A protein has these predicted regions:
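Conserved hydrophobic/aromatic pocket- or pore-lining residues that grip, position, or stack substrates
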Residues: 137, 213, 235
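Glycine-rich beta-to-alpha transition loops that act as phosphate-gripper elements at the mouths
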Residues: 90-93, 114, 203-204, 222-229
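Glycine-rich beta-alpha junction loops
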Residues: 139-143, 227
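N-terminal capping/small domains of soluble enzymes
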Residues: 2-138
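An N-cap/entry alpha-helix motif that binds or orients negatively charged groups
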Residues: 2-49, 157-205
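Catalytic cores of alpha/beta
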Residues: 122-124, 227-236
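Short acidic active-site motifs
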Residues: 95-98, 209, 230-232
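A structural motif corresponding to the C-terminal end of an alpha-helix
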Residues: 208-221
Length: 236
């Protein structure tokens, strides 16, 4: 359906950030060296000292079940097959426990700022109990971005159906029938749809919160979204 395609394919605001990222990436070049024996070669790598079979990982993405039934499970199984990290979004449409199971331990949980310390500690304990060794804390989204595609198409989670959405779904029967048989995508880590607000402010995140998180999380902690060298140095 159009509203889901534009959610996946689109970008925030006028798309200038995405365009700038693409422009920069196009300027990267690989410089090869000649006359080096490469009969024995491997893509094996280490990501934060964790051995992997590929020098990549799968970024955390919320509600990927909207793209297709079983999408979360496929991501987790792919991570297991190639022994690469898969980021589990707080807003994932499959539970963090199932991600840990299907990925065979290659899942890293991505956490947003939470003002409620009691709920945060409850979630951290749940993540630990599921066997997670790495936590990703997102710091570059203090407020949710302006997403005109979602506003224009009326995309909301949980799904709210109106004439526009029903007409869109009717034009894509394969997706609609499969989704109807399996149920509308929902947040996999929260049984109460009101317990997680995708658009909630995360503006309260600060250095004190990071220290608090470091004190309450015993395993590896990855900070996602650091764009300033001074911040990176301070985080060491």
């Amino acid at each position: 359906p159009k509203l889901l395609f534009e959610y996946i394919d689109g970008a925030a605001s006028d798309g200038s950030g995405e365009a700038e990222n693409r422009r920069i990436i196009r300027h990267f070049r690989l410089k090869t060296k000649a006359l080096i024996n490469v009969e024995q070669r491997s893509l094996n790598h280490k990501v934060f000292r964790i051995p992997t079979k590929l020098p990549v990982g799968i970024a955390p993405m919320g509600m990927v079940q909207m793209a297709g039934v079983g999408a979360d499970e496929e991501f987790a199984k792919f991570a297991s097959k190639y022994e690469i990290p898969v980021g589990v979004s707080t807003a994932a449409s499959m539970s963090l426990e199932k991600y840990a199971e299907y990925s065979r331990g290659y899942a890293w949980f991505q956490l947003y700022y939470m003002a409620d310390k009691a709920e945060l500690e409850k979630l951290l304990n749940r993540i630990l109990m599921a066997g997670y060794k790495t936590l990703i804390f997102t710091v570059d989204v203090p407020e949710i971005g302006f997403r005109p595609n979602e506003i224009r198409n009326g995309l909301k989670v949980p799904f709210k159906f109106g004439p526009k959405q029903i007409f869109d779904f009717a034009l894509h029967p394969a997706w609609s029938l499969k989704t109807l048989m399996n149920g509308a995508p929902k947040f996999g880590n929260f049984t109460d749809t009101n317990s997680f607000n995708r658009g909630a402010s995360r503006a309260g995140a600060d250095w004190d919160f990071l220290r608090y998180l470091r004190d309450h999380w015993p395993n590896k902690l990855v900070i996602k979204g650091v764009l300033n060298t001074d911040d990176a140095i301070n985080m060491k």
